[in-house]
Amino acid sequence: MRKQNGKSDLSRRGFVASAAAATAVASVLPAPAVLAGGRPRVVVVGGGAGGATAARYIAKDSQGAVDVTLVEPSRAYYTCFFSNLYIGGFREWESIGHSYGALAANHGVNVVHDWAVSVDRDNRSVGLAGGGSLAYDRLILSPGIDFRDGSVPGWDLSQQNRMPHAYKAGSQTQLLKAQIEAMPEGGTYCMVAPPNPFRCPPGPYERISMVAHVLKQANPTAKIIIVDPKEKFSKQGLFEEGWQRHYPGMIERIGPDFGGDMVEVRPEAMEVVVDGEAMKVDVCNVIPAQQAGRIAAAAGITDDSGWAPIVPHTMQSRADENIHVLGDAALQGDMPKSGFSANSQAKACAMAVRGALTGSSVFPPRYSNTCWSLIATGDGVKVGASYEATDEKIAKTDGFISQTGESAELRMATYEESLGWYDGITADMFS
């Protein structure tokens, strides 16, 4: 793991160009023969960083040779990445919302706003909640996450309005922000953090930082408690340094050594029970254990882990060569579950799908990821790595991370870099 040293400028153009280069290296793999008959059909389920990117690149780069349909129930997509900044007051809600209109207008993607509820692998079709089905030659599943039933005793989705998860961006994010802002003076915010693996490893701890930022200004005697089943977490040294600097005495973390892995909640009483001891809280943000979005299990491509194993070079399901799985839902190896990862995987997948269906050139993929986090105003940190496809997994080849004790100028530059990345990736997904 190498240190972060120096300022880099990740503009929209630079992000798209560097990401494209990541999927192109010198040697060309043999391409399959072009399918006979009419245009081959690709159905993409899920319109996030994986699915929207895959749909856009297949449609754009095939220049109409492939019929691409994107199935996504929401007409506006709100990014989970940067939703913590909305909670912290650094972004307006509308700034993290995006529409699918340009995918249709600019690239001819057929956008179907419906839920995909079933997959008939024998007949290669996807069933829709609204009725009917969509036939495919290749299916790309990028459904994100669902929560594991019973992972936090006392909590299920029926309690999400009393104790929100806010880990799928949308009304839950807005609800949690409103609850934080309505806390009584000197009140207590509690987060029940998830076990590994889960979406966006630094995400819960950036959220803690953003909640602390809000409370420091509006409710400085409030307390924040993290109940955490994990012994350690992403960027731990950086977050703990930042919490001590910006929010001294406000944040307490209860790890597994003190019962953080033995928690239950009582939503009606607004209580959190840690190792048998109950405490009253005013806001409780429960982030449960996670698994692949339910359509992956419905397709029969998940294993006992709840995630969908894939072939690292193509993101194909190990259970069905005509299905590819992207992003959070994939069991792929060393890459974290992040929007950057999903976008990187989508480009490799799009290249593989075009090669299989049209005979276009296919290159060995290279993957990358960076996760930025904001701790306080202008105090940005990051962690990232490069990866390669092996026969067994997507394997990390090198990495970097911000360092404790960095200058304010470098931290501001890191935050500004994250803003450029956000503009770049959302353009890469939706333009």
Protein language model annotation of sequence segments:
Residues 157-183, 278-344, 355:
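FAD-site-proximal beta/loop scaffold in flavoenzymes
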Residues 9-30:
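N-terminal export leaders
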Residues 106, 110-118, 126, 134, ...:
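A Rossmann-like FAD-binding core segment of flavoenzymes
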Residues 342-366:
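Internal hydrophobic alpha-helix adjacent to the cofactor/substrate pocket in enzyme cavities
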Residues 35-110, 195-236:
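Beta1-alpha1 glycine-rich phosphate/pyrophosphate-binding loop at the start
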Residues 143-218:
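Glycine-rich dinucleotide-binding loop and its adjacent helix/turn
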Residues 1-10:
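N-terminal secretory signal peptides
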